[in-house]
Amino acid sequence: MAALVAAEAAESCSRNGPGRGRAPRGRLANQIPAEILNNPQLQAAIQVLPSNYNFEVPKTIWRIQQAQAKKVALQMPEGLLLFACTIVDILERFTEAEVMVMGDVTYGACCVDDFTARALGADFLVHYGHSCLVPMDTSAQDFRVLYVFVDIRIDTAHLLDSIRLTFPPASALALVSTIQFVSTLQAAAQELKAEYRVSVPQCKPLSPGEILGCTSPCLPKEVEAVVYLGDGRFHLESVMIANPNISAYRYDPYSKVLSREHYDHQRMQANRQEAIATARSAKSWGLILGTLGRQGSPKILEHLESRLQALGLPFVRLLLSEIFPSKLSLLPEVDVWVQVACPRLSIDWGTAFPKPLLTPYEAAVALRDISWQQPYPMDFYASSSLGPWTVNHGRDRLLQVPGRLALGKVQGGPARPSPAAACEACSCRDEEVSPIAL
C-alpha cells in the first residue's frame, strides 16, 4: 500500500457511490495484472525477502513496465539497504530495466533524490520507507517516482496487551507512529476504542497517526498520554516537544517493550533562546540551503533573503548536503547561521556549533517577525503552520479549492496513508483501497 487513489478516482466514487457506476479510470490504469500477481516464479523470488515487510514488488514491477523505464534507481534508508541487492535482482529479472542502488544517506522523505537519479540517467525512482512528502514536478513526463512505504507487520496482540497492562480503562490515549507502522496503529486503535478514549491525530498533509521528526500535531488537553509505535526516539521526541505536558510512552515492536519516555524541555528551550538572543546582535548572517535530496526549501530561503534585505543585514548563501561544525568554522566572519534543511539539527545539535545555528522559525523570532512560542512549534511540513518559514505554509487554503481532493480518512475502515494532494503528480497511487486487518 502506498497511498490513496487518484483525485479523479476518488471524486468519481463519491459521485456514483460505493460499488456503483463506472469503475474509476485511476484504478483500472493502476490495477496490477494477474500475470504479475500470480506469477509463481515471482512469488518464489519474493519469499527471499522478510515475510512481514511489504516491499510491494509486484506493484513496482507493474509501474516500471507501465512507464517503459530503462534505468531504475532505488533509494532507501540505511536500515533497508541490506535488502537492496535482492530487490535489484528481482526487478532486473522481471523487467527490462537496469536497476541501480543510490547509497547516499537517506534520513527521511525530505531526502528523496530525484535530482541525482536524473543526473545518473535514471528515468524511474523507487523511494522506500517514507511517505509522499515532497511533490514531484508534473512537467517531467520522462521521469516517474514511486513511493513504497514498506509496511511492517508486527505482533499486534502484544502491543494491545502492553497498553492494557499499562493504562487503566477509559484513559485518553493518542496513538502515533512512523509510516511503516501506521496501518497497524490504526487497526490497533479500532480494537482499543471499546476500552479507551483513543485518538489517532493527524497533522496534514501526513497520514492519520503519522509523525515526522520535524512535524507533529498539538494534542488536545484532555489527552492523558501519547503512545508512539516505533524503534528509536527521534520521531517520538517530535511529538514530545510539541506536547510538553503530556506523558509519552514508546512501544518498540522489535524488543516488545513499552517504556515511559522523558525529554528535557527546559534545557532545550534555554539553549534555543540563548542562540536567538545571540543572533539578534549579529552583524553578518549565513543562510544554508540543504542539498540532501529535496531537504532544502528554496521558498523558505527566498523568504529569509527578503527579510534580511529589508532589514539591511548582509548575508551569504551556502549550499550543503550535510552540515557539520568543522565546515561552518571555515567561514568565521559569519556571526549566525540559519539552516533550511532539518530543524532537528539545530534543536538536537545546535550547541555543538561555535556560532548560533538557527531554524527558520528561530530566525523569525530573532528578526522579531514572531514572538517565542509555547510549546515549541513542530510544524515544519504542516499544511497549517505559523508562517512562511515553513515548507507548506498556506497550503491548507489551497487544498480547499473546488475540485481538489481533500485529505483525510477512507470511509468504511481504518484510515489509509494519504499523501499530499500534489501526490497526484507521482506514481504512488494505490490500485485498491481496503482496510488493514489485525
Curated annotation (Swiss-Prot):
What EC designation does it have?
2.5.1.108
Q: Which cofactor does it need?
A: [4Fe-4S] cluster
Main localization, broad class: nucleus
The listed locations are: Nucleus; Cytoplasm
List of residues that carry Phosphoserine: S418
What does the record give as the reaction this protein catalyses?
Answer: L-histidyl-[translation elongation factor 2] + S-adenosyl-L-methionine = 2-[(3S)-amino-3-carboxypropyl]-L-histidyl-[translation elongation factor 2] + S-methyl-5'-thioadenosine + H(+)
Give the co-factor note. Answer: Binds 1 [4Fe-4S] cluster per subunit. The cluster is coordinated with 3 cysteines and an exchangeable S-adenosyl-L-methionine.
- Record: residues binding [4Fe-4S] cluster: C110, C214, C342
A Pfam match is: Diphthamide_syn
Return the GO cellular component terms, semicolon-separated: 2-(3-amino-3-carboxypropyl)histidine synthase complex; cytoplasm; nucleus
A GO BP annotation? protein histidyl modification to diphthamide
Pathway given for this chain reads: Protein modification; peptidyl-diphthamide biosynthesis
Record's InterPro entries?
Answer: DPH1/DPH2 (IPR016435), DPH1/DPH2_1 (IPR042263), DPH1/DPH2_2 (IPR042264), DPH1/DPH2_3 (IPR042265)
Q: Does the keyword Glycoprotein apply?
A: no
Keywords per UniProt = Cytoplasm, Iron, Iron-sulfur, Metal-binding, Nucleus, Phosphoprotein, S-adenosyl-L-methionine, Transferase
Q: Name one GO molecular function term.
A: 4 iron, 4 sulfur cluster binding
Function, as annotated: Catalyzes the first step of diphthamide biosynthesis, a post-translational modification of histidine which occurs in elongation factor 2. DPH1 and DPH2 transfer a 3-amino-3-carboxypropyl (ACP) group from S-adenosyl-L-methionine (SAM) to a histidine residue, the reaction is assisted by a reduction system comprising DPH3 and a NADH-dependent reductase.
- Oligomeric state and partners? Component of the 2-(3-amino-3-carboxypropyl)histidine synthase complex composed of DPH1, DPH2, DPH3 and a NADH-dependent reductase. Interacts with DPH2 and RBM8A.
UniProt record similarity statement: Belongs to the DPH1/DPH2 family. DPH1 subfamily.
- PANTHER family found in the cross-reference section: 2-(3-AMINO-3-CARBOXYPROPYL)HISTIDINE SYNTHASE SUBUNIT 1, DIPHTHAMIDE BIOSYNTHESIS PROTEIN
Q: What is this protein called?
A: 2-(3-amino-3-carboxypropyl)histidine synthase subunit 1
- Originating species: Bos taurus (Bovine)
